Design a protein with these regions (language model features):
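N-terminal cap/lid segment of alpha/beta-hydrolase-fold proteins
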Residues: 1-9
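Conserved HGGG/HGGXW glycine-rich cap/lid loop of the alpha/beta-hydrolase fold
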Residues: 11-63
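Membrane-interface segments of envelope glycosyltransferases acting on lipid-linked substrates or membrane lipids
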Residues: 3, 32, 51-52, 57, ...
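Active-site acidic short loop of glycosyltransferases
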Residues: 7, 21-22, 87-90, 112
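Surface-exposed charge patches
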Residues: 1, 44, 81
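Short, hydrophobic alpha-helix immediately C-terminal to the catalytic nucleophile
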Residues: 40, 80, 104-108
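Conserved hydrolase catalytic core segment
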Residues: 89-114
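Active-site loop/oxyanion-hole signature of alpha/beta-hydrolase fold enzymes
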Residues: 48, 58-94
Length: 114
């Protein structure tokens, strides 16, 4: 799936599923210098369990456009914009390595979103 945030393309592996607002959504965040590929087995498993799953490529990583973001805070703000663009209302965030820090910052800044 490719969508735009601030006029830059964002890539997300979505396992070919159609987003369903009625389902719980899980966003998977990779670590520094990685991409959605680190979640290639996990995303399929979670989708098979009935969740909407988005394994995102952060800016400057994988297939997403833009420069790498400079701080965990910037990444959390960017993630909030992604959530709004997609229209996610029922959300869990899983992170690997740096992705965990982004998930923690996001939940601290936007507790009503998770």
């Amino acid at each position: 799936m490719i969508f735009e945030v601030e006029n830059k393309k964002v890539f997300s592996s979505d396992i070919g599923q159609t987003f369903d607002k009625k389902k719980h959504t899980i966003i998977l965040l990779h670590g520094s210098g990685q991409s959605h590929v680190v979640w290639s087995l996990t995303d399929q498993y979670l989708a098979d369990q009935g969740y909407n799953v988005f394994a995102l490529d952060l800016p400057g990583h994988g297939n997403s456009e833009g420069s790498s973001l400079r701080s965990i805070e910037e990444m959390a703000e960017w993630l909030h914009r992604v959530v709004k663009v997609i229209g996610i209302e029922d959300l869990t965030i899983l992170g690997h390595s740096q992705g965990c820090l982004v998930a923690l910052e996001y939940t601290s800044k936007f507790p009503d979103s998770v």
